[in-house]
């Protein structure tokens, strides 16, 4: 990384941290009095869009989106490739309102955790995989019924560029049981915002939104088949926009990161 890009990256982190502090402080006082959708727009959507703008202007990371016509009118379960922090910012600012799966322990962090709780996340206990799946099913279904998108990273963690992690069935199970489709999303954000290290590299991220996929039937077999279709689409699309994919050999993730 060049000296200029290193300076731009440091500046990006400084501005992002400062904006998070200011926005977080304002949100702590304003968010509790707002209804959920207005709260989401103020606390999450606006700041995440600012973060993406900052990424473009300061770090030189742009993006292009294909497949906008595939987004269904009714919120459903989003199954996204996970390579970096960028897609969390982008998807949170793009889909509204959106509920994410997170570790339950984060809700106990003073101020930060309390603010998260106001955004109605899906809090799970990752130390107990079976319980986590039940929590995802229950809380996720409640979010969908209230008209919120549910974002799941089925690989369970950020996967290095050029690799694919095995998809957990938690997201497809949630969709099938709710009678809704899954919306697969592929992107190559990790090429410019790597999982490891602090460096950011200028370039254009390709985001591809796939066709909404419905299950054929019900039950475990339908869940597994839908999961395979979603995983295959993401893998094939990643091969088009990113280096050749290589399967990551690790146990199937319990739910998500």
Curated annotation (Swiss-Prot):
SUPFAM superfamilies: Glycerol-3-phosphate (1)-acyltransferase. A motif (HXXXXD motif) lies at residues 82-87. Disruption phenotype: Inactivation of the gene alters the fatty acid profile of the membrane phospholipids by increasing the proportion of longer-chain (C18) fatty acids. It leads to structural changes in the bacterial membrane and alters the membrane properties, resulting in decreased membrane fluidity. The keyword Zinc-finger does not apply. Its main location: membrane. Keywords: Acyltransferase, Cell inner membrane, Cell membrane, Lipid biosynthesis, Lipid metabolism, Membrane, Phospholipid biosynthesis, Phospholipid metabolism, Transferase, Transmembrane, Transmembrane helix. The chain crosses the membrane at residues 10-30, 105-125. GO terms for biological process: CDP-diacylglycerol biosynthetic process; phosphatidic acid biosynthetic process; phospholipid biosynthetic process. SMART domains: PlsC (SM00563). It is a multi-pass membrane protein. It is an enzyme of class 2 (transferase). The HXXXXD motif is essential for acyltransferase activity and may constitute the binding site for the phosphate moiety of the glycerol-3-phosphate. Converts lysophosphatidic acid (LPA) into phosphatidic acid by incorporating acyl moiety at the 2 position. It holds the Pfam family Acyltransferase. Belongs to the 1-acyl-sn-glycerol-3-phosphate acyltransferase family. It is found in: Cell inner membrane. It comes from Pseudomonas aeruginosa (strain ATCC 15692 / DSM 22644 / CIP 104116 / JCM 14847 / LMG 12228 / 1C / PRS 101 / PAO1). Can complement the E.coli plsC mutant. GO terms for molecular function: 1-acylglycerol-3-phosphate O-acyltransferase activity; lysophosphatidic acid acyltransferase activity. This is 1-acyl-sn-glycerol-3-phosphate acyltransferase.
């Amino acid at each position: 990384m060049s000296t200029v890009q290193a300076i731009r990256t440091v500046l990006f982190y400084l501005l992002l941290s400062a904006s998070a502090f200011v926005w977080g402080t304002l949100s702590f006082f304003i968010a509790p009095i707002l209804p959920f959708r207005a709260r989401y727009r103020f606390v999450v959507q606006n700041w995440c869009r600012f973060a993406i703008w900052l990424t473009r202007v300061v770090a030189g990371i742009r993006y292009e989106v294909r497949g906008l016509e595939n987004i269904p009118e009714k919120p459903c379960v989003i199954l996204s490739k996970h390579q970096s922090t960028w897609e969390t910012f982008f998807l949170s600012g793009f889909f509204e309102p959106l509920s994410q799966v997170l570790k339950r322990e984060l809700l106990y962090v003073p101020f930060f955790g309390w603010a998260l709780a106001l955004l109605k996340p899906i809090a799970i206990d990752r130390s107990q995989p079976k319980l986590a799946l039940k929590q995802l099913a229950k809380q996720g279904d409640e979010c969908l019924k209230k008209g919120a998108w549910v974002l799941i990273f089925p690989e369970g963690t950020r996967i290095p560029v050029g690799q694919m992690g095995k998809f957990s069935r938690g997201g497809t199970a949630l969709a099938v049981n709710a009678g809704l489709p899954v919306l697969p999303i592929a992107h190559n954000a990790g090429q410019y915002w790597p999982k490891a290290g602090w460096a950011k590299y200028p370039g254009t991220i390709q985001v591809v939104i796939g066709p909404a996929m419905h299950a054929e039937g019900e039950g475990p077999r339908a869940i597994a088949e839908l999961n395979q279709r979603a995983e295959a689409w993401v893998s094939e699309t990643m091969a088009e926009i990113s280096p050749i994919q290589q399967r990551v050999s690790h146990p199937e993730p319990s739910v998500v990161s």
